[in-house]
Swiss-Prot record:
Name of this chain's protein: Large ribosomal subunit protein bL28
Quaternary structure and partners: Part of the 50S ribosomal subunit.
Lineage: Bacteria, Thermotogati, Deinococcota, Deinococci, Deinococcales
Keyword Ribonucleoprotein: yes
Stored Gene3D superfamilies: Ribosomal protein L28/L24
GO molecular function, one term: structural constituent of ribosome
Name of the coding gene: rpmB
InterPro entries: Bacterial_rp_bL28, Ribosomal_bL28, Ribosomal_bL28/bL31-like_sf, Ribosomal_bL28_bact-type, Ribosomal_bL28_sf
Native species: Deinococcus radiodurans (strain ATCC 13939 / DSM 20539 / JCM 16871 / CCUG 27074 / LMG 4051 / NBRC 15346 / NCIMB 9279 / VKM B-1422 / R1)
Family indicated by similarity: Belongs to the bacterial ribosomal protein bL28 family.
Keyword list, A-Z: Ribonucleoprotein, Ribosomal protein
Length: 81
């Protein structure tokens, strides 16, 4: 099972981690210089939860946003257990 929200489709993002040195121009410096860029993974806020869909019980990954939606009541035939 991939780490992707069953309801919203949210998943991990690959982003750049930018390392800088120096003092900003606004603070009286000559500006910030980029000294390194590396890729990193920004993880989605996912939780493994049991749901009931069409009478069947499934264990799926759900985002925090989807959990808030489901806590208000059934949504598209899906409910939390």
């Amino acid at each position: 099972m991939s780490r992707e929200c069953y309801l919203t489709g949210k998943k991990n993002l690959v982003v750049n981690s930018v390392i800088r040195r120096g003092k900003a121009r606004a603070d009286g410096g000559v500006g910030r210089k980029t000294t390194g860029i590396t890729k990193r993974v920004q993880r989605a806020n996912l939780h493994k939860k049991a749901i009931r869909e069409n009478g069947q019980v499934k264990t799926v990954w759900l985002s925090a946003n989807a959990l808030r939606t489901l806590s208000k009541g059934p949504y598209k035939g899906i409910e939390l257990i």
